[in-house]
Regions:
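Mixed-charge (Asp/Glu-Lys/Arg
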Residues: 1-46, 52-157
Length: 157
């Protein structure tokens, strides 16, 4: 592991769960506000859902999750129901100086393909879920959702 990678791993490992959640919500809120959106943060510190009002007045929901490479993030299908105004934002803590951010429209799960997963969990104790594999091998497929400066702005007009 390079010194730079170790420094980043150490930096992220010092953050508590609530600090990780807050970091992700702050990063995503700043990006949305830079597009002219109004963002209403949840009252609960552990709730990653942001209520957004676009410059045109359209309402949207963004489910934010801060994760490390190698993980798996999921939302129950009961909570994340695909709709044109519903998104997930992944703040990925990797080797870079700043976290990578990905924005996935919830409608992508209507025909999920890797790294997106659609699990019904029939006969299991877990609820049906939509998820995203964050394994290193899945990252190239996740690139299509990368939220860089200028990209994804059309989602929030």
């Amino acid at each position: 592991m390079s010194t730079s990678s170790k420094r980043q791993d150490d930096r992220w490992s010092q953050l508590s769960r609530s600090e990780l959640i807050a970091l992700g919500k702050r990063i995503v809120s700043e990006r949305l506000e830079s597009l002219g959106c109004t963002v209403e943060a949840p009252t609960s510190l552990s709730d990653g859902r942001l209520h957004v009002r676009t410059p045109s007045g359209r309402a949207a929901e963004v489910f934010v999750s801060t994760q490390r490479v190698g993980g798996y993030v999921f939302w129950t299908k009961r909570r994340l129901q695909p709709a044109d105004d519903r998104f997930t934002a992944i703040v990925l803590l990797a080797d870079a100086d700043e976290p990578d951010v990905y924005l996935v429209p919830s409608t992508e799960w209507l025909s999920a393909s890797p790294p997106l997963t659609d699990r019904d969990n029939v006969g299991k104790r877990s609820e049906p879920e939509f998820g995203i594999s964050l394994a290193r091998s899945s990252l190239p497929a996740l690139e299509r959702y990368r939220w860089d400066e200028g990209s994804r702005a059309d989602q929030f007009r």
